[in-house]
Amino acid sequence: MVFSSKTRGLILLLIASIVWGSTFVPQKIAMQDWSALQFTSFRFLIGGIILFSFIKFSSEKIKSNFEFLIISLLSGLVLALAALTQQIGIVTTTATNAGFYTSLYVLIVPFIGLFISKSLHWSIWPSIIVCFTGSVLLSSSGDSISLSNISNGDLWVIFSAIFWAIHLHIVSYAVLKLPIFKFSIIQFIICGFLLFIYGSIFDSQNFLNFTNVSSSGIFYLFYCSLGSVCIGFTLQMFGQRLVEATPAALIMSTEAIFAAIFAWIILSEVLNFNGLVGASLIFLGVIFVQLAPKVKI
């Protein structure tokens, strides 16, 4: 069976979403052994180094060393901020919440687009209201529905969505202009290296202390390096090159669903009624903001 390039791209993005969804659980469990800064730094360094070992098999050519370096540095920096703030949030929120709050980056993408002369579609405003309502319900405790129920961990993950949205814009440009495989490798190494330098300088006593790291902690680190970094992000790069922005964002939004499924299977995380309604509203809001601009009335 021969698939069209678009179908291949959608399959790659779906696999990436499943893999990303599966990594929220080990990201959560690994916090028993690692600090958020340690885990994020080594996760991307290891992933980048593993991929670098395959670079000799790539025939991609770099047309402009300057452009490649600048975009890779910028992408690596934004990726470091996105991954670290998300990981800090995962320490004190659930894997399920982290998955759905991360998906809010889809709402932020249009606002980032304003800086590159893209106008906002009216659908963004009802989507924000729906997702805000969903966020309050998702963080609710029992019958208590209040903004005060949104934890610091939830806020950190929501904050990370801003950087994920910026990173998506950078990647959207990079996949059209740069050799994707080499770009992926360099941005991962830059991301991990920047966090390593930061940790070594400003938190050296804790960052370089591995006495509490167990074999299971090492396993979860390597799983996230291989799964999230080597497989997930790399498939995203190649998938986005073959698929238009809207279907790509829709497919990647399913990451939240897979995160909830894996959290239920492995961690027995179960949403209460308010949580289920909230998660559904967030997902619907994310889907609506992508589909509405395509509907002709």
Model-derived regions: residue spans:
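Glycine-/small-residue-enriched transmembrane alpha-helix faces in small-molecule transporters
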Residues: M1-Q38, L77, L81, T85, ...
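Hydrophobic alpha-helical transmembrane segments of multi-pass integral membrane proteins
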Residues: T7-L12, Q38-S53, S123-T133, N152-W156, ...
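Helix-helix packing/entry segments at the starts of transmembrane helices
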Residues: S17, T40-F42, L84, A98-L104, ...
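Specific transmembrane alpha-helical segments of multi-pass solute transporters/efflux pumps
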Residues: T23-F24, F52-T102, S135-L137, F219, ...
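C-terminal transmembrane-helix exit sites in multi-pass transporters
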Residues: I50-S59, Y105-I129, I257-L276
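Hydrophobic transmembrane alpha-helices of multi-pass small-molecule transport proteins
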Residues: L51, L73, L120-G142, L195, ...
